[in-house]
């Protein structure tokens, strides 16, 4: 058997990131051949990664990297939040975002083939990370945004990277772009404007809002409060010219019935129409950026605030770690038992 030195073990560990015992075993198996030992480490790493492939990785971090007029945002998952706070994991996330920004891949398949700063492919980096960290580490998704010289990136990460936002703003400055990114992190809009909402989605959301009104009305009835009416519309997309014209006619009829003189109608109608628009765009307010009240100035919507500073949002991406992933629920005893088996 070859005589394995501490220097060889150290060199192999620095090259592969393997643990002390794994490095020593690989060198023994390779009879001191460093190149063969590296191959053994990688082979065993792939085997470990394969065993963990079916595990659910729903924790992790987002990463953002800005390089001139190109920026990338990524989500990288681990099985536990503890590992997500590991420095090796954080480095992997940051290097992934950098690699994506510089490579500008079209999809995950192209992304996995890109070369990381370490010289290995992104896919190899994740196989090796799974082996050395001891949990399933997976590259989930990414987005690449580009801007012109006159536009600004707004990048923001909340809760240590649990939520990541990247936005492109026309006009204003970098501070405004970051504030918009912070708003997006807090209010989680799905799209920029009502024009991007699917009609079926609007109908479903409107039905949910009316279901909530029904529940509220049950409580109101118990204390003899009048029932709230159902919402007929939920989005600007549903408010056609005919609908708006009819709403104005209804307001005029209401004012006439109340005996309000026609000479003051022009002062009353705009406010009532604004209220009509507010009451009938609830789906927009919950799901579209421009219709939301701006967190930095809640007297205005985001759209109104941007207009006041002569700016506009070109695009945005918001990633929240684990969203859409069904997490496995285990009690503490089961978790400990599972760890003892591994």
UniProtKB/Swiss-Prot annotation:
The keyword DNA repair does not apply. InterPro entries: EF-Ts_dimer_sf, Transl_elong_EFTs/EF1B, Transl_elong_EFTs/EF1B_dimer, Transl_elong_Ts_CS, UBA-like_sf. GO terms for cellular component: cytoplasm. SUPFAM superfamilies: Elongation factor Ts (EF-Ts), dimerisation domain, UBA-like. The keyword Cytoplasm applies. Its main location: cytoplasm. Residues 80-83 are annotated as: Involved in Mg(2+) ion dislocation from EF-Tu. Associates with the EF-Tu.GDP complex and induces the exchange of GDP to GTP. It remains bound to the aminoacyl-tRNA.EF-Tu.GTP complex up to the GTP hydrolysis stage on the ribosome. Belongs to the EF-Ts family. This is Elongation factor Ts. It comes from Lactobacillus delbrueckii subsp. bulgaricus (strain ATCC 11842 / DSM 20081 / BCRC 10696 / JCM 1002 / NBRC 13953 / NCIMB 11778 / NCTC 12712 / WDCM 00102 / Lb 14).
